[in-house]
Amino acid sequence: MQDPRHPQGLPLSPGLPKRQRQDRTIYNWKQQEVLENHFKEEQYPDYDTRQELAEMLNLREYQVQVWFKNRRAKRSRERWFQKQLQQLQKHPQQQHPQQQHPQQQLQQQQPQQQPQQQQPQQQPQQQQPQQQQLHQQPQ
């Protein structure tokens, strides 16, 4: 049996109902402003506070809970990036090996060698006349 919701014809699981995913919640600017202000004061609101916010903003408690969870994750990411930026500003020459160009990594891994001075080689064209002179017999 084919699932009519999937034009590719994915088969249905027999006997088990499909779990419906809730649509993404889009918060208007007023909801965001209120939630952000509460987040500044309390990053982990309890159930009663979330319930009050949900009623005030015409949302479900679960949506408020998810908003706070996502906002804490965003704060964590921002702190991590800020820390990375501060480290780069303190030590601009020191980069994490994965942040370097592969050529830079190779240069750092190889021991520093002094380039050997090579003596210029005579070109074959210059040697040919000398060889011809040696092989020629005087007349």
UniProtKB/Swiss-Prot annotation:
InterPro entries assigned to the protein according to its UniProt record, in alphabetical order: HD, Homeodomain-like_sf
Family: Belongs to the paired homeobox family.
GO molecular function, one term: DNA-binding transcription factor activity, RNA polymerase II-specific
Cell location: Nucleus
Location of the region described as Disordered in the Swiss-Prot/TrEMBL record: 1-22, 78-139
Pfam families in the record: Homeodomain
Protein known as: Tetra-peptide repeat homeobox-like protein
DNA-binding region, residue range(s): 20-79
Role noted for this protein: Transcription factor required for zygotic genome activation (ZGA), a critical event in early embryonic development during which the developmental control passes from maternally provided mRNAs to the expression of the zygotic genome after fertilization. Protein produced from maternal transcripts that binds and activates expression of key ZGA marker genes, such as NANOGNB, ZSCAN4, DUXB, KLF5 and DPPA3. Binds to regulatory DNA sequences containing a 5'-TAATCC-3' sequence motif.
GO CC terms in record: nucleoplasm; nucleus
Organism annotation: Homo sapiens (Human)
Biased composition (Low complexity): 82-139
Encoding gene (name): TPRXL
Keywords on record: Developmental protein, DNA-binding, Homeobox, Nucleus, Transcription, Transcription regulation
GO biological process: one example: maternal-to-zygotic transition of gene expression
